Amino acid sequence: MIHAIKVTITVYVFSMFCYSVWYLLQYYDVAGLRLPDEWIGSLCYLPHGARVLMFCFFRYYSLPGLYLAEITGPSLIHHNDYMDGWSIAAVGSLFSVVAAVELVKWTRATPGFFSFFKEVNFENYKFLYLVIIVSSLLNGLLVNLILSVINTTSAISAVTVFRFAVGDFLGAIAVIATLWVIFRTLIDTRLIIDPRVED
């Protein structure tokens, strides 16, 4: 129980940090893209990186913290950017990551018994990138489908789905690249010890 609470708090804090950084970057238009309002913020959606990393490394323990961040992040940061029904669409966002991880596990299944509880080692980045690609595509479809059903005034469009998929992909890659640079720098300056190096 204590482990689940620690994971939930860790996941929530990291996800909210990603929401905060993402919102500041898109609000101040750091890239200077001067895009139309509906495009702002969705071209590099950092919270998707938090979803993928937290689920890949903390598995199902991360879902409460991720869902809490999905429903409170927009409210605490800037609720006007989100449509009605976002708390339901957040389930679709989380399901896209869970489904992507399970698909990667299924494609790696060895002959014999297949199990949803089979471990996947994400230390090899190619599986992590595969999860990012699949979850970005699924998230673009699922979230837009759910929002179009809930908000009958908005229709689902291929451009919006594509924009969501690209934004989720770029956001997840940005989060992973940033963390990689940070931890690589800490290891190189010997502020942390590389776990792969034996004494």
Q: For each of these PLM feature ranges, what is it?
A:
Residues L46-S62, L66:
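Generic transmembrane alpha-helix motif of multi-pass integral membrane proteins
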Residues A4-Y12, M16, S20-L53, H78-P195:
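Membrane-embedded alpha-helical hairpins and interfacial helices in multi-pass inner-membrane proteins
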Residues S62, S75-L76:
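Short alpha-helix boundary/capping elements
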Residues L66-P74:
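Small-polar-interrupted transmembrane alpha-helices in polytopic inner-membrane proteins
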